[in-house]
């Protein structure tokens, strides 16, 4: 399983985000962010088959969405790493930044860390201290009901095939570029062979025609 979505926000103002796959993440995230108090806190919300983990510090919320069987320790390791990198990079600028002001830069950081913490299953066993384990025990898990603006019950809808489609497009593009490169390589090789053949024929025929200017073979 993987971390499906990550976002950094100030209250309900999203500053940066990244999604591992397709889904109505923003619609659901807006509902979650509206329920998070502004004081420093750590909490996990449970909704259906998904968990919403967050750390709120200095009014900045670091939140990620995972499957319900994804280890919470790994999720909070991810959030702590994101928090550290975000604070180091932006500091107090985040307190007055406009929506998505950091997205162009920080979304790539979210993507890299999301991939890293999703794939390294042994990460929490190697890096966690006992203090981190004890801290995790103090982070509550609460069930949460989400309601859309229409008043309907809001469910998190995820399309993991979008990630597969992106991978397929990347593979096709790479294959196309490789084929084009091979074609150019073969064309260059063919041209070189033709040039060498012409030079070789010229050298062989020149003595028979009286020299390099072919005086005996070319009519004046």
Swiss-Prot record:
Its main location: membrane. InterPro entries: Longin-like_dom_sf, Longin_dom, Synaptobrevin-like, Synaptobrevin-like_transport, V_SNARE_CC. Residues 2-188 are cytoplasmic. GO terms for cellular component: endoplasmic reticulum membrane; Golgi apparatus; late endosome membrane; lysosomal membrane; neuron projection; phagocytic vesicle; phagocytic vesicle membrane; SNARE complex. It comes from the Eukaryota. Residues 125-185 form the v-SNARE coiled-coil homology domain. Residues 210-220 are vesicular. It is found in: Cytoplasmic vesicle, Secretory vesicle membrane; Golgi apparatus, trans-Golgi network membrane; Late endosome membrane; Lysosome membrane. GO terms for biological process: calcium-ion regulated exocytosis; endoplasmic reticulum to Golgi vesicle-mediated transport; endosome to lysosome transport; eosinophil degranulation; exocytosis; neutrophil degranulation; phagocytosis, engulfment; protein transport. The modification Phosphoserine is found at residues 167-168. Residues 7-110 form the Longin domain. The modification N-acetylalanine is found at residue 2. The chain crosses the membrane at residues 189-209. GO terms for molecular function: SNAP receptor activity; SNARE binding. Keywords: Acetylation, Coiled coil, Cytoplasmic vesicle, Endoplasmic reticulum, Endosome, Exocytosis, Golgi apparatus, Lysosome, Membrane, Phosphoprotein, Protein transport, Signal-anchor, Synapse, Synaptosome, Transmembrane, Transmembrane helix, Transport. It is a single-pass type IV membrane protein. The keyword Lipid biosynthesis does not apply. Belongs to the synaptobrevin family. Involved in the targeting and/or fusion of transport vesicles to their target membrane during transport of proteins from the early endosome to the lysosome. Required for heterotypic fusion of late endosomes with lysosomes and homotypic lysosomal fusion. Required for calcium regulated lysosomal exocytosis. Involved in the export of chylomicrons from the endoplasmic reticulum to the cis Golgi. Required for exocytosis of mediators during eosinophil and neutrophil degranulation, and target cell killing by natural killer cells. Component of the SNARE complex composed of STX4, SNAP23 and VAMP7 that binds SYT7 during lysosomal exocytosis. Component of the SNARE complex composed of STX7, STX8, VAMP7 and VTI1B that is required for heterotypic fusion of late endosomes with lysosomes. May interact with STX17. Interacts with PICALM. Interacts with RAB21. PANTHER family: SNARE PROTEINS (PTHR21136), VESICLE-ASSOCIATED MEMBRANE PROTEIN 7 (PTHR21136:SF196). This is Vesicle-associated membrane protein 7. It comes from Bos taurus (Bovine).
């Amino acid at each position: 399983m993987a971390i499906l979505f990550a976002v950094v926000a100030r209250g309900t103002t999203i500053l940066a985000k990244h999604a591992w796959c397709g889904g109505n993440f923003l619609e659901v995230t807006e509902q979650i962010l509206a329920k998070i108090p502004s004081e420093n806190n750590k909490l996990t919300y449970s909704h259906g088959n998904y968990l919403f983990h967050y750390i709120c510090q200095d009014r900045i919320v670091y939140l990620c969405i995972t499957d319900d069987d994804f280890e919470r320790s790994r999720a909070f390791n991810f959030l702590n790493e994101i928090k550290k990198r975000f604070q180091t990079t932006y500091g107090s600028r985040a307190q007055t930044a406009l929506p998505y002001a950091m997205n162009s830069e920080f979304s790539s950081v979210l993507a890299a860390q999301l991939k890293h913490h999703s794939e390294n299953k042994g990460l929490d066993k190697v890096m966690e201290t006992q203090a981190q384990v004890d801290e995790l025990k103090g982070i509550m898990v609460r069930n949460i009901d989400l309601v859309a603006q229409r008043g309907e019950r809001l469910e998190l809808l995820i399309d993991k095939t979008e990630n597969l489609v992106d991978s397929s497009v990347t593979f096709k593009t790479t294959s196309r570029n490789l084929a084009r490169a091979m074609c150019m390589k073969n064309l260059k090789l063919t041209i070189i062979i033709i040039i060498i053949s012409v030079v070789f024929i010229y050298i062989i025929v020149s003595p028979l025609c009286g020299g390099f200017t072919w005086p005996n073979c070319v009519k004046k």
